[in-house]
Curated annotation (Swiss-Prot):
PANTHER family: MULTIDRUG RESISTANCE PROTEIN (PTHR11206). One of its GO terms (molecular function) is xenobiotic transmembrane transporter activity. Keywords: Membrane, Transmembrane, Transmembrane helix, Transport. It comes from Arabidopsis thaliana (Mouse-ear cress). Belongs to the multi antimicrobial extrusion (MATE) (TC 2.A.66.1) family. This is Protein DETOXIFICATION 17. The chain crosses the membrane at residues 29-51, 70-90, 111-131, 140-160, 177-197, 205-225, 252-272, 286-306, 326-346, 363-383, 405-425, 431-451. It comes from the Eukaryota. It holds the Pfam family MatE. The keyword Transport applies. GO terms for biological process: xenobiotic detoxification by transmembrane export across the plasma membrane. It is a multi-pass membrane protein. NCBIfam families: matE.
Length: 476
C-alpha cells in the first residue's frame, strides 16, 4: 500500500456502521417519544380522578387511593402483562410481512382478556369485603368498595385498549395512539369536573369518569383501525381463526402477565409493609411519595421498553438478526443517557420534591433523604425496562418471569424486610431491597442478552409466526 493512500474499504465499513447507528437512534427516538407520551397520558387518568376526589375530603381521598392501588394489583397489571404477549406475536409477524396475522392475534388477545376480565370484575365487586378481611378501616373499605364497583366497566375497556395499542405499536404506528390518548385525557378532565363537582356523584363520579374515558379511547382507536388505510392489510375484519391456537397464545401470554405482575406487586407489597414499621404514618407517607415518583418516571422507561420490543421483534421477524442486535445496543445506550438525566434531576430537587406531596417538615426531610436511593432505583429501572422490552421482542417471557421471581421474591423483598425490620433501617431498608432486586434483574437480563445467538432467535421468530409461504395480507 502506498503512503498517503487511505484504505477505502475500512473507511466505508466505519462510515456504514455510523450511518446504521444514527438511523437506529432516529428510529428508536421516533418510536419512544410518542410511547412515553402514551404511557404518561394513560397513567394520568387514574391520578386525575384521585386528585379530584381529594377536594371532597380526607376519607374519599384515602378510599380512592386504596381502591386505585387495589385495582392496579388485582386487575390492570394482570391485563397489561397478558396483552404484552402481542409485542412478541404482532411485532414478529409484522417484521415477517405476515400482515393478516396481526389482526388475528389482536382478536385472539381481546377474546382472552375479555374472559379474564370476568373473574377480575367479581374480585372488584367484593373489594369492600376483601379490604375489611385484611383489617382496613371499615369506613374507608366501604367507600373504596363503592369506588371499585364504578370502575368495573373500565376493566373490560382497559384490556381491549392494551390490545389495540400493541397492534398499532407493532406496525410502528404510534402517533395515532398518542393523539387518541391526549384527546381522552382532555375529555377525562372535563368528565371529572362534571361528574365529581357538578352532578352530585362525588367520588363515584371520579370512578365512573375512568370507565367512560377508557371506553372512549377504545372507540377512538377502533375507528382508526377500521377506517385508516394504514391498517387495511393488518385488519381485514373479524375471523373465526381468532378462536384457534388459544393454547399457543397462552404459552406466551401467561408468562408475560407473571413477568409484569411479579415486579409491580413487589413495590406495592413493600409500601404495605411500611405500615407495620414504627411511626407507620410517616413511613407510609414517605414510601408513597417514593412510589408515586418512581411510577411517574417509570412511564418514560415503559416508552423506551416499548420501542426496544418493537424494533427487536420487527427485525427478528424480518430475518435481520444483526440489525436486532444493533437495536439492543442503541436502546441500552439511550436508557443509560435517560437514567443519568433522571438521577441528576432527582438529586437536584431532592430537598423540594416533598413539598409537592406534603407540608409536614418531617415528611419533607425524610423524603429528601430517600431520594438518592430512589434515584439509583430509577436508573436501574430504566435499564431493566429496555432489557425486558428486548425479552418481550424475542419471546423470552418465561425467562423474564423466572428472573423477576428470583430477583424480587428470593432477593429483593426478603432483603428489604430484613433491613427494614431486623436491622431497623425502616423505609430506607425496604427501598434498598427494591434497588437490590433491580440490580439482580438487570444483571440476569444483561447476561441473557449478551450471550444470545441472534441468528438462532431469528429462526425461532420465523417458526413462531409461520412460513413465509403463508403471507396472508402480504404487501410487496
Amino acid at each position: 500500500m502506498e503512503d498517503g493512500v487511505t484504505p477505502p474499504l475500512l473507511i466505508t465499513e466505519k462510515d456504514t456502521t455510523m450511518i446504521r447507528v444514527k438511523e437506529e437512534v432516529k428510529k428508536q427516538l421516533w418510536l419512544s417519544a410518542p410511547l412515553i407520551g402514551v404511557s404518561l397520558l394513560q397513567y394520568s387518568l387514574q391520578v386525575i380522578s384521585v386528585m379530584f376526589v381529594g377536594h371532597l375530603g380526607s376519607l374519599p381521598l384515602s378510599a380512592a387511593s386504596i381502591a386505585t392501588s387495589f385495582a392496579s394489583v388485582t386487575g390492570f397489571t394482570f391485563l397489561l402483562g397478558t396483552a404484552s404477549a402481542l409485542e412478541t406475536l404482532c411485532g414478529q409477524a409484522y417484521g415477517a410481512k405476515l400482515y393478516g396475522k396481526l389482526g388475528i392475534q389482536m382478536q385472539r388477545a381481546m377474546f382472552v382478556l375479555l374472559i379474564l376480565s370476568v373473574p377480575l370484575s367479581i374480585i372488584w365487586a367484593n373489594t369492600e369485603q376483601i379490604l375489611v378481611l385484611v383489617h382496613q378501616d371499615k369506613s374507608i373499605a366501604s367507600v373504596a368498595g363503592s369506588y371499585a364497583k364504578y370502575m368495573i366497566p373500565s376493566l373490560f375497556a382497559y384490556g381491549l385498549l392494551q390490545c389495540i395499542n400493541r397492534f398499532l405499536q407493532a406496525q410502528n404506528n404510534v402517533f395515532p395512539v398518542f393523539v387518541c390518548s391526549g384527546i381522552t385525557t382532555c375529555l377525562h378532565l372535563l368528565l371529572c369536573w362534571l361528574f365529581v363537582l357538578k352532578t352530585g356523584l362525588g367520588y363515584r363520579g371520579a370512578a365512573l369518569a375512568i370507565s367512560v374515558s377508557y371506553w372512549f379511547n377504545v372507540i377512538l382507536l377502533s375507528c382508526y383501525v377500521k377506517f385508516s388505510p394504514s391498517c387495511s392489510h393488518s385488519w381485514t375484519g373479524f375471523s373465526k381463526e381468532a378462536f384457534q391456537e388459544l393454547y399457543d397464545f397462552s404459552k406466551i401470554a401467561f408468562p408475560s402477565a407473571v413477568m409484569v405482575c411479579l415486579e409491580l406487586w413487589s413495590f406495592e407489597l413493600l409500601v404495605l409493609a411500611s405500615g407495620l414499621l414504627p411511626n407507620p404514618v410517616l413511613e407510609t407517607s414517605v414510601l408513597s411519595i417514593c412510589l408515586n415518583t418512581s411510577l411517574t418516571i417509570w412511564q418514560i422507561s415503559v416508552g423506551l421498553g416499548g420501542a426496544a420490543s418493537i424494533r427487536v421483534s420487527n427485525e427478528l421477524g424480518a430475518g435481520n438478526p444483526q440489525v436486532a442486535k444493533l437495536a439492543v445496543y442503541v436502546i441500552v445506550g439511550i436508557a443509560v443517557a435517560e437514567g443519568i438525566v433522571v438521577v441528576t434531576v432527582l438529586l437536584s430537587i431532592r430537598k423540594i420534591l416533598g413539598h409537592a406531596f406534603s407540608s409536614d417538615p418531617k415528611i419533607i426531610a425524610y423524603a429528601a433523604s430517600m431520594i438518592p436511593i430512589v434515584a439509583c432505583g430509577n436508573f436501574l429501572d430504566g435499564l431493566q425496562c429496555v432489557l425486558s422490552g428486548v425479552a418481550r421482542g424475542c419471546g423470552w417471557q418465561k425467562i423474564g418471569a423466572c428472573v423477576n421471581l428470583g430477583s424480587y421474591y428470593l432477593v429483593g423483598v426478603p432483603l428489604g424486610l430484613l433491613l427494614g425490620f431486623h436491622f431497623h433501617i425502616g423505609g430506607r431498608g425496604l427501598w434498598l431491597g427494591i434497588v437490590t432486586a433491580l440490580s439482580v434483574q438487570v444483571l440476569c437480563l444483561s447476561l441473557v442478552t449478551i450471550f444470545t445467538n441472534w441468528d438462532k432467535e431469528a429462526k425461532k421468530a420465523t417458526n413462531r409466526v409461520g412460513s413465509s409461504d403463508d403471507k396472508d395480507g402480504d404487501v410487496q
